[in-house]
Amino acid sequence: IKALLLDQRYFPGMGNWMVDEVLWRAKLNPSNLSGGISKTDENRLFKQILFVVNGAIKSVGKHGGDPPKGWLFHARWKDGLLCPKTKNPLIREQIGGRTTCWCPSIQK
């Protein structure tokens, strides 16, 4: 699903950190196949796309600042950091050729 969300033909403007943020908030594993998610997961995904894009426009786009505290953004850049929600270790790995940060305890 991560590769689909990064495809600019379908989701223009969605960058790597934004896709990680969306999937984390939607509680979806970035390795899931895009055709294999339920309608409930799909609805949650689209809701989080809107939330993250709007939040990024308000915080990052306006002044070039960082997203709000509590976002995955702040914990995704280095190995060994903890999930802001669960305080469990985050995984950083390559998915679809991109560095991906996700929390296996909540992203199924």
Regions found by a protein language model. Name each.
Residues 1-108:
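Basic, nucleic-acid-binding surfaces and adjacent catalytic neighborhoods in DNA/RNA-processing proteins
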